[in-house]
Amino acid sequence: MVNAQPCNVLMVCSRFEAETFWSFKKTSAAVGAKHTSPPLGLITVAALLPPAWSVRLVDRNIEELTDDDLDWADLVFTGGMLSQGADALDIVDLCRARGKPVAIGGPGITSSPHACPAANFRVLGEAEGVIDQFIEAWEAGEREGVFEAEKFKVDVTKTPIPRFDLLKFDDYLHVGVQFSRGCPFTCEFCDIIELYGRVPRAKTNPQMLAELEELYRLGYRGHIDFVDDNLIGNKKAVKAFLPELAKWLEAHDYPFEFTTEASINLADDHELLMLMNRANFVGVFVGIESPDPATLVAMRKKQNTRRNIAESIHTIYAAGLFVHAGFIIGFDSETQSAADAMVELIEEAAIPVCMVGLLYALPNTQLTRRLEKEGRLHPPHERKDRHGIVGADQCTLGLNFETLRPREEVLADYVHILKRVYDPAAYAGRLLRLAKLLANCSRRQPSRRSAGKREMLHRIMANMPEPRELFGRTLTQCAASNPAAARRILILMTLYMDLGPFSRDVIAHIENMIAELAPGAIEPRAHLERASSTLAM
């Protein structure tokens, strides 16, 4: 690598084609951003390249890929998650048409390695495990190849600081960093343990603080998301890191606040919750999936059983962290009471933001292997028109298998949940209850956006969906009941600018699917298989 010849590398982040639950386009626009977060994977790969190689980044979620960009490049890197698959294929085709060698990598192609034969190079698995081989092959003049990393063997303590200097910070709601990879649990539907293993590998404390120092040096201030799939998967490591993070924050006058994802057993560890509080963590995503213990056991998510889930969420609130939660409908063991039980849990726990989706059998998971063995998995179909499914995401692409309950019953339950959970009054009510439950919120808040707070508040309220008066009144009541939590309540309220309209779009889409299941309608499986082909990439 030391003697590598100069090479112009164009990193192209593929576009999330569909409107997804996490798009938050209206929220981003309200605060002057264009997209939620930058491509941490690509800028990490950029840091692994030889110093002699020049690197540029084009994120198609915020800007267009131009002819000048491609003219400059000697080599193009692209890829991403399954939901970016259609655009990644378009990028590969464009590069091949322009005679530009292109490499594709990331979790999408790793899960479905045969999905993109047109790419010159396919990089499968964690890039650190094969990047030296790739560079050597390129330097030797090779222009085709497949490079596959040995699973779960990458030493993340040797991963360099991502190339944060390639980012345009103001274009994003927040930036991401990663402390660890892997999760110790065995959820049947999850692909994380297939991609990164069940033994979480963590970076060192100095290494992680160096990444934050670089962001600070580059002038970034504000929200940072730890993108770990389970930050507390290695409790020993994270408990050693958080006190050091708290010291760093104090020494730098609290430039950042953090969110992350963690398993619900976080609520069982008061010490860990207080460490996160002192390290300026303000929110956490928790996968709840189902309120039914039998369903949780069947999906191998036993960590969510033997507990009162609402009380566990309230314990996290008491430590000053709000909770976003994930729920899934469509499991084999569900009963006709599944929908009402899910809504009741969401209301009792007072979780405003709930990602409720249809079960989808992701490539290379325990669930997919079981359904395939049982003869219930719908076969993937190659989609010739890649843009024919714009607007579909995990909320509408699910159930790519034969359900045990009648399909129309599962879909009707899904509509019922979304209508109740994202009714404006219900959402506002959960905000009010959350404001009373959030404690320990009196912490330093970083300032980032140039627009004045009053101006931003007016912009947000002007863009809230109807009934605006309800949300204005709710914000006033929340601020009166818990002034220290008012800013966080405002953030969660702002998200309804996207979640309200998005839920109504999903409801309309699912109701059309139910109509197609009526006697004399077209075969429903064909509809779902056309949609599922995007995720099969």
Regions found by a protein language model. Give the residues of each.
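Radical SAM enzyme core and accessory elements
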Residues: 1-11, 54, 69, 382-537
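Conserved beta-strand positions
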Residues: 11, 78, 226-228, 286, ...
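Structural detector of well-ordered beta-strand residues that form the stable sheet scaffold
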Residues: 103, 123, 146-148, 259, ...
